[in-house]
């Protein structure tokens, strides 16, 4: 027996797996690197001080500042991940809409093409990404220089304030400074679930082929 997955469904799963792995692995990799750097700084300070505590302290404090700046990289990483997670969703919807020839890459329109409807959970995911995640992405990409809400003010302000209240993001002096990693993962998981359902509605499935009694060639046995 052999299982063959439609290329679009395979793309949805492989890109999800890649993004999910990045989210899961980066914090531990960063912490390992920071720990190693801290150990090297301490060793350097001890060697340079030769027993003089004040020299050790000054050297350590001077060198450790470059390690502390690495925590800023995690903030930038999470911002970049949010942008990539949204792009994964947006580009896949565009691909699906072109494949099935609908005018707009909206999940409901893609489903309606096949006389199908999305359940309440998937509708909520679609609306959340459109109403909350997309404005956040737009702010990060186009307007995160201390002038929050300047573009598309009404929608952006409502969305950002909602995310602030939920503690999904932090804002300082008009700039989005941090995004909760668990929030990004939750968005990614929801997008993946919705995209897989749309792929199923479009007929993009995994098909299991195998032999049946009396047949010399493989035939479809089941799909999912």
Question: Which role does the model predict for each range below?
Answer:
Residues 1-79, 152-224:
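Extended intrinsically disordered or low-complexity regions, especially N/C-terminal cytosolic tails and loops
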Residues 76-185, 218-222:
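Flexible secondary-structure boundary motifs
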């Amino acid at each position: 027996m052999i299982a063959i997955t439609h290329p679009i469904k395979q793309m949805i799963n492989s890109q999800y797996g890649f993004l999910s792995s990045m989210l899961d692995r980066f914090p531990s990799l960063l912490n390992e690197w920071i720990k190693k750097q801290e150990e090297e700084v301490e060793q350097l300070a001890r060697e340079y001080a030769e027993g003089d505590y004040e020299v050790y302290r000054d050297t350590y404090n001077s060198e450790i500042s470059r390690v502390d700046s690495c925590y800023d990289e995690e903030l930038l990483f999470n911002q970049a991940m949010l942008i990539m997670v949204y792009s994964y969703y947006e580009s896949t919807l565009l691909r699906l809409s072109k494949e099935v020839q609908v005018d707009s890459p909206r999940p409901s329109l893609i489903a309606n093409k096949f006389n199908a409807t999305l359940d309440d959970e998937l509708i909520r995911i679609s609306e959340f990404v459109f109403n909350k995640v997309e404005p956040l992405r737009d702010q990060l990409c186009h307007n995160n220089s201390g002038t929050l809400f300047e573009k598309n003010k009404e929608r952006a302000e409502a969305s950002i304030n909602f995310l602030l209240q939920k503690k999904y993001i932090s804002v300082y002096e008009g700039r989005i400074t941090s995004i909760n990693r668990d929030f990004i993962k939750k968005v990614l998981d929801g997008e993946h679930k919705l995209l897989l359902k749309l792929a199923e509605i479009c007929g993009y499935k995994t098909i299991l082929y195998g032999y049946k009694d009396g047949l010399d060639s493989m035939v479809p046995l089941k799909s999912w």
